[in-house]
Amino acid sequence: MDPKEKNYDASAITVLEGLQAVRERPGMYIGDTGITGLHHLVYEVVDNSIDEAMAGYCSRIDVRILEDGGIVIVDNGRGIPIEVHERESAKQGREVSALEVVLTVLHAGGKFDKDSYKVSGGLHGVGVSCVNALSEKLVATVFKDKKCYQMEFSRGIPVTPLQYVSVSDRQGTEIVFYPDPKIFSTCTFDRSILMKRLRELAFLNRGITIVFEDDRDVSFDKVTFFYEGGIQSFVSYLNQNKESLFSEPIYICGTRVGDDGEIEFEAALQWNSGYSELVYSYANNIPTRQGGTHLTGFSTALTRVINTYIKAHNLAKNNKLALTGEDIREGLTAVISVKVPNPQFEGQTKQKLGNSDVSSVAQQVVGEALTIFFEENPQIARMIVDKVFVAAQAREAAKKARELTLRKSALDSARLPGKLIDCLEKDPEKCEMYIVEGDSAGGSAKQGRDRRFQAILPIRGKILNVEKARLQKIFQNQEIGTIIAALGCGIGADNFNLSKLRYRRIIIMTDADVDGSHIRTLLLTFFYRHMTALIENECVYIAQPPLYKVSKKKDFRYILSEKEMDSYLLMLGTNESSILFKSTERELRGEALESFINVILDVESFINTLEKKAIPFSEFLEMYKEGIGYPLYYLAPATGMQGGRYLYSDEEKEEALAQEETHKFKIIELYKVAVFVDIQNQLKEYGLDISSYLIPQKNEIVIGNEDSPSCNYSCYTLEEVINYLKNLGRKGIEIQRYKGLGEMNADQLWDTTMNPEQRTLIHVSLKDAVEADHIFTMLMGEEVPPRREFIESHALSIRINNLDI
């Protein structure tokens, strides 16, 4: 035996005490230490509050991302117990509060006591103690029995004992934590991920109010999630931009006794005129993306009830096709939620429910309720049946079209290389395919590419809008057929096979004009609706060709966006410049000048925030009241109504909410007060205020330039200062704006857009499937009014010089 080898005996066995195991192997407890694991920390804390709500003790949860990167979760539940925990105190030989036990001992909490909670969620039962272990700092505040208590921890270890803070009328628990950068690859919370989950929880728990805020972004308004209709409201939300077959979603609920106690099952369902099935399933509020026994039971009962109804009413006399579950679920939007006392999940991340008794409960509840509904609502039942028959006929037609496409593709494969310019590499993991707009750009891309691993697929014009088309029509579209054949992985739920994908990266490269944006959206719609796994597995990217080429003598650089262009021009304009405030003789150069410019840019950002909310800055300035200041809120009328007004305090806001009919008006928070005060304070240092941006000041601002000392320029508003410096930056440079890829030669295309060492790609990911479906339906679907309303509400945020006319 090599003496260097260590003996494997009892001394090699390590026992990790307390929360040390969580810190040593965090992936075992939260899945990973990336963006997913980071957000699971928030879910664990929120799930505790939801458990309180499900038990009937909590009606409101507030989640707020702090400006310094922390996050705070507050509820109005019973509050975590703070009394001495007898068993743990005896074990440790000191007084240990129940709060400390909950926050420092794995698998400790009320959810393991069926008298406290009948059902509960949570990730793996490790709860808030896991959050504590993986946080650089955590502060728990409990409001209970008219008193406030607090305790602080660092990486799971108590920093302060449980302390009485003050008298308080509040009730509940507040958790503030900061993720540990030693554990997580990123500690930056993504609000879209959090909002998706909070919205789900508000839908799944009828009547609870969840409020979300993000202090990092001055333009972000507080969002309140409250849905009295529960999952019925969820289905209405999912179908809001679709043409529903009937007005109100069907709601089904029932309770049956399972192996471990009562199982509560509820479902809401509604068909629309579209062709996509959209079904979300949950168990104890946890999304089960791979379904499980509750979804199987629901689908089985749905198919059986509809087939039975067709047979009982002799509705199939002119339709001899055998119906499938796929036919029945075409255009179906449904949400299924089950509450199980002892849920059994398959896999560590709870993707699939495994309780066998849930399937029979779902079949009983759905079967009985849907049968009664169809008998009581024969018109709705007939509309559903008619749609099912049309879906079956379309399925047969699509099957023939698919077979024809595959047969034609096999017999006429020599035609494919004429479109697809393939690469030499055969390992899909090393290959990428550019989908390029037009033959001209395709030619440049072919010449500029690295032929070893980059394939080029030019497409002509705008492809079919698949949001408005059945599969039969999709298979008949030449451009889509070419894309399907080039990728090699098939299409649709039954025929898609990711392992046959020929290119690991699919890069959409279109022009920077309106047509290019439209083609990109059509392609993304196709991938999202019919090759969703490509987006879920992060195979789709969007190329970012430059918008400008800026040349100065022999030097040049490429610029990707208007914002980058503005920054570059300002940098050039301030390099050799100075600013003199005439009234005080104060002069700014170098870093001091840059700081002043940044203050002006903060003012511009503030103005943009207002104008995105349809509040003109000039109007905002006019609303100033002596002794009160600027307004805080705007009471906005509903679309097509008149009579908005400004509000100057929280008291005015509360009065307005009490007096006005809330469906006719909405309260818009104009800005974050702290941010506004900070901008005002910075401006005061220069003898200015917020109105200085537009209203001419007595304090003359003189811009001087070292290259031309005699060409000083006097400004009287901050807007003039910014515009003059940008114009100064334009002197001596040549600016070329690219509208099409064809305007670049092969070398330029390679240098800017195709070279992996230098290019910028946008990674297409699916953070919020509900919101993605909502956006694609609104922008690409049949319903015009929602699209018009979206365009009208966002029109003010479009810069005029970005419009392609």
Curated annotation (Swiss-Prot):
Mg(2+) 1 binds at E437, D511. Its main location: cytoplasm. Heterotetramer, composed of two GyrA and two GyrB chains. In the heterotetramer, GyrA contains the active site tyrosine that forms a transient covalent intermediate with DNA, while GyrB binds cofactors and catalyzes ATP hydrolysis. Belongs to the type II topoisomerase GyrB family. Mg(2+) 2 binds at D511, D513. Binds two Mg(2+) per subunit. The magnesium ions form salt bridges with both the protein and the DNA. Can also accept other divalent metal cations, such as Mn(2+) or Ca(2+). Residues 431-546 form the Toprim domain. This is DNA gyrase subunit B. InterPro entries: DNA_gyrase_B_C (IPR002288), GyrB (IPR011557), HATPase_C_sf (IPR036890), Ribosomal_Su5_D2-typ_SF (IPR020568), Ribsml_uS5_D2-typ_fold_subgr (IPR014721), Topo_IIA (IPR001241), Topo_IIA-like_dom_sf (IPR013760), Topo_IIA_B (IPR000565). A type II topoisomerase that negatively supercoils closed circular double-stranded (ds) DNA in an ATP-dependent manner to modulate DNA topology and maintain chromosomes in an underwound state. Negative supercoiling favors strand separation, and DNA replication, transcription, recombination and repair, all of which involve strand separation. Also able to catalyze the interconversion of other topological isomers of dsDNA rings, including catenanes and knotted rings. Type II topoisomerases break and join 2 DNA strands simultaneously in an ATP-dependent manner. The keyword Transcription does not apply. One of its GO terms (biological process) is DNA topological change. It is found in: Cytoplasm. Its EC number is 5.6.2.2. The gene is gyrB.
